[in-house]
Amino acid sequence: MVRIGNSWDEILADEFRGENYLKIREFLKDEYSHHVCYPSMYDIFNALKYTDYYDVKAVILGQDPYHEEGQAHGLSFSVKKGVEIPPSLQNIYKELQSDLGIPPAKHGCLENWARQGVLLLNSVLTVRAHLANSHKNCGWQQFTDDIIKKLNERDTPIVFILWGANARSKKQYITNPIHYVIESAHPSPLSAYNGFFGSRPFSRTNEFLKSAGIEPVDWRTE
């Protein structure tokens, strides 16, 4: 049985006992036994471990983990300190500087965001090395759909930041009118100039949180 160590354990108890997660678990046993996969099996649920269900102020939804060695550690778009900053995160930092004047960090670790209530969730939580989206059909999509549905039930407002088509596909589960959705193109170099740059997601998130009486996010990572 998975143990997150906070209120997600109770919130997701039915999901972890359900047929879909049992199927995921069997798939991962085989994948991690026979292939190099990321993140480490101990980091798969880091997004939930770092950000308790009742602490979530904002959700930044990614696609699947980085698939090269040393990058993924269970938080969407984040890499551990000392790892080269990936292109999508470089663009996120550029938009952060344009939006709020915060200079790009010298590292790519976003744990500071997660500890403040920013759920850095990927739609798919694992990947085989060097093969992007290789675990997309193992059941993770349904599992993270269920997470979004649980967050939608919250009676405290949340900002959902959806970058790119994959993330925007989950908008259908955000039906509670108290929440706020920010959507744009993905920050990857292939699409960032199609609407990500200039979308001001960070200031818009904080403006909404302040209007709801919620402490804004300090978007610095240093």
Q: Can you describe what each PLM-predicted range is?
A:
Residues 2, 14-162, 166-169, 174, ...:
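A polyanion-binding, active-site-adjacent surface
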Residues 194-196:
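A non-catalytic structural micro-motif
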Residues 5-8:
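Short, contiguous pre-domain boundary segments
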